[in-house]
Amino acid sequence: MKKTLTKLPFLLLVGILALSACAPAATTSTEAPEAAPTEAATDEPVATEEVVDAPFTAQVDADLVEAFTALYQAYYPDGTPAIVDSEADLLVTAVAAPEGVPTAIPATFLPGAVLLPQSDSADVADFVAFAISINGQQALIDAGLLPAVVTVTDQGGNSVEIAQPLHTLISTYGPVTAMVYAVNGEETLAAASYLGARDAAGAAAMEAIDPRFQDLIGDDYFSQTEFNIEEAARLAPDLIVTSLRTEWLDTAGELGIPFVLYDAETPDRLKEAMLLTGDLFGPQSAAQAEAWVAYYDWITAAILSETETIAEADRPSVLFTGTEPLRVASGDMYQTSLIEIAGGVSVSGELTGYWNDVNLEQIAAWDPDVIIVPPYGGATVEAITENPDWQILTAVQEGRVYRMPKLVVPWDTPAPDSALGIIWLAERLFPELETPDCTEQANFFYNTFYDYAIPSEQVESICAIN
């Protein structure tokens, strides 16, 4: 089940430095490296003269005592924290930014300041969960230690002021809905548009991640083309997140609700979008966004280290089709970036805009080595491989027509899950190279960013050649 703001996140329950069952080791180039050792702040911990009767003890950096005390007194209104200088149940400290891929994302209550449980105490677990919740964030705002308003610049170049903490949110753009989940902001969702959840398998997976899914899905009301102003007014969200290509922005403006625009059709813009999403929700979400960016950078570096020396003439040509076989991805779309990172050459990369409709003569002229179809819109491999007109193509003749995977969110879209799409595509294009293993990384990814323990048979099926 997905992490909530009322329970300690799964990763913390199993230990801040432990994800060995789902996080890859760092022994070969196909496995995620271990995190760099955490550097604690140089401030000496502050201890009380006498340990008071408290549910747990804490070792606290000197400059974090005020924040810790504010949280403690908000959670235990009549209590006094027991601050000690060693052997504490909870370590409250500042840490340097990790240089490698983190094996866990610690509870971050202020930028760069974390809560590290040192025991299995349920009281510690409950307190840590509170500290990174909306209520904990509010306690730090009331103490003047976090801002009551944050100002972000969205991907349309707009400066947007957002009251903190964020309580309710409408997401009308599926890729951004996935970003909200990946940074632990889903508790704020009042309604959302979801990618990949229309089929039974996608809906079942989404319900396993978030039991509220059936109550939240709002595709009939909110999408890039639809906006039900009456329903939006009823839900009264603090914020609306949507695509830069959305058609109803003027209508939404009538409500006076701030909205943040996204346009993440390149890897750099996707990383920017994730960091933007983290900033909407506070320090814990910002830390999760930073961890995802580090993970994405590791994957792209691992793939590029294997593919960047391949001569242009030896790179397979790839066609990415859309919901119809004759609809193809342009060079302005994220799918083209995935192909390039994985070591291929997009045959339709010179096209501009969004999806382009072409004819079979054009595809025959391109004659791609590999064809990728998406896992949405009813697109199938068989629509191409069983069509007699397509038998002239090299990709069809050599059996290299594949369907991009998905659990819920399709792995080709500008969303967090696309990190796995890079791995999967590189395995299809260059099976002989040492690239990160799809099944290992899918386990790591969904545990870390969705707190979902994906069943082994399911992940093996998703990563398999289809």
What does each model-found stretch correspond to?
Residues 52-62, 80-83, 150-151, 167-170, ...:
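Short, well-ordered beta-strand elements
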Residues 61-80, 134, 178-187, 196-207, ...:
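Short, polar/charged alpha-helical segment
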Residues 47-148:
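Exported/periplasmic ABC-transporter solute-binding proteins
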Residues 44-57, 76, 158-165, 183, ...:
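Immediate post-signal peptide segment of exported/extracytoplasmic ligand-binding proteins
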Residues 122-126, 146-152, 159, 248-327, ...:
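Extracytoplasmic substrate-binding proteins
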Residues 14-50, 103:
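Ser/Thr-rich, Proline-interspersed low-complexity disordered segments
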Residues 171, 177-235, 239-245:
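A short, structured surface patch at a secondary-structure boundary
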Residues 328-355:
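Alpha-helical, coiled-coil/dimerization segments enriched in small aliphatic residues
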